[in-house]
A protein has these predicted regions:
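Active-site anion/phosphate-binding pocket segments in diverse small-molecule metabolic enzymes
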Residues: 1-167
Length: 167
């Protein structure tokens, strides 16, 4: 149909990170438009994949945000300094690394709330938690810089040149 319409089919491009392994089976397909695979996020983790219907684990998450506990006064609840302005309101919510039972809610602009029934340790005000972001695209747009870290050492500071450039 596309050939009959006179379209150039040298490049037949589409799909994305979540469908990269499906699109390659489409006849004539030449190019997959993956981009988020670089970072991954909670949305991709939860969609499932061709190899694992429960979780998309073809690529590991690399984009995280460090948040600080600012209140621990209530049993089963922590308050952090990362709300919707740091993590967006996208679903699913952020995943706390090392704490699979934590439920993160970034519903407030400036603060996040974590509820849990069990945790791996006792947390105090000032403790840091690393969270996997809900949706990488809008989260990157919220920051001026990205820190490239390897083995707990900052190797590079990268400016986000397109930050806030939505039109």
């Amino acid at each position: 149909m596309m050939k009959a319409a006179g379209l150039n089919l040298e490049i037949f491009s589409g799909g994305g990170t979540g469908t990269y392994d499906i699109m390659t089976g489409v006849p004539g397909f030449t190019d997959v438009q993956v981009g988020s695979y670089l970072f991954m996020d909670c949305q991709y983790i939860e969609i499932g994949g061709a190899q694992n219907e429960t979780v998309f684990d073809d690529f590991a998450p690399s984009l995280t945000v460090m948040t600080t506990i600012v209140n621990n006064n209530y049993p089963g609840r922590l308050v952090t300094d990362s709300g919707s302005k740091a993590l967006t309101l996208n679903q699913p919510t952020a995943f706390v690394i090392g704490e699979p039972d934590f439920k993160y809610n970034a519903g407030s602009d400036e603060y996040g709330s974590i509820t849990f029934e069990k945790s791996s340790k006792s947390y105090k005000v000032g403790d840091k938690l690393e969270v996997i972001v809900p949706h990488c695209d809008p989260v990157v747009n919220l920051y001026d810089f990205m820190y490239a870290i390897r083995k707990e050492k900052v190797e590079s500071v990268l400016p986000i040149l397109a930050r806030g450039k939505s039109q």
